[in-house]
Amino acid sequence: MVYTVTFNPAIDYVVHTGEMKLGSTNRSDREEMYFGGKGINVSIVLRELDIQSKALGFTAGFTGEAIENGLAEMGIDTDFVHLQNGNSRINVKIKSAEETELNGQGPDIDDEAVNKLFAKLDKLQDGDTLILAGSIPASLPSDIYEKILERLAHKNIRTVVDATKDLLLNVLKYKPFLIKPNNHELGEMFGVTLTNDEEIEKYARKLKEMGAVNVLISMAGDGAMLIDENGEIHRCGVCNGKVKNSVGAGDSMVAGFTAGILQGDYEYALKLGTAAGGATAFSDGLAQKEKIAELLETL
């Protein structure tokens, strides 16, 4: 079973307008609403790839109920911890000539709620996959990723960590099955600017030496690179298409890779991850099955 964790789920309210004038009343041409948060995005794309998952995390208030109901209608299992106070956040994304985002803060998460999440995670079994993605809300302990991986270290669980900087570096000692920084994040972690494939490979291998089992590096227009558990390097080019959306492309890549490794080998997983990321980038929302399959054929 695949489990995803989203600490701070959101409703993304996307507003399209021809021209945005600050300080004036603006009217939208159209609106969309999506249920978001990095782990939730992964669960949604996994569903498109016929992989069942269960979304964990925290929800609060009427917006939290809307998120849970919406995911249920999409066929996604959830087991969120319900917070007593506050509301799950709403992120406003304004798309005009320029794209503007105003992201909500989200509810406070107390120790009791954290312990309830830990209790749910303690039930994971050998062979399960756990995907941790995204930043940590201010009300959570900064080492919660470490605490989760430490609790599960005695089990044979595939852990996927999609985070950056110290959040990522501090969990490498627990040997996560997959990490996915992009090339810029990789450079930031080591205080260097990476200018070519050789340098990217060098520092990706450093992360592997520090404990990561597989290191997946997304490189935007230059494709993706994977250093697998055997130290072999795999490369994949980019999908061709018009970029419409940057939100969720990385999460989609994680979903595609996870589905691919459950269904095939590393080469296939890298291609499926690349296709899923591209399908989201070329769509208004998250990747759909037909677009993923179409792009996969081109890789």
Model-derived regions: residue spans:
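Glycine-rich phosphate/adenosyl-contacting loop at the front of the ribokinase-like
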Residues: 1-56, 64-66
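Short beta-strands and strand-loop turn motifs
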Residues: 101-103, 128-134, 162, 180-185
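Hydrophobic alpha-helical segments and helix pairs
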Residues: 108-123, 127-152, 158
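Charged helix-capping and loop-helix junction motifs
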Residues: 115-118, 142-149, 195-201, 236-241
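Conserved phosphate/ATP/ADP-binding segment of small-molecule kinases
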Residues: 146-230
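Conserved phosphate-binding/catalytic region of the ribokinase-like
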Residues: 197-299
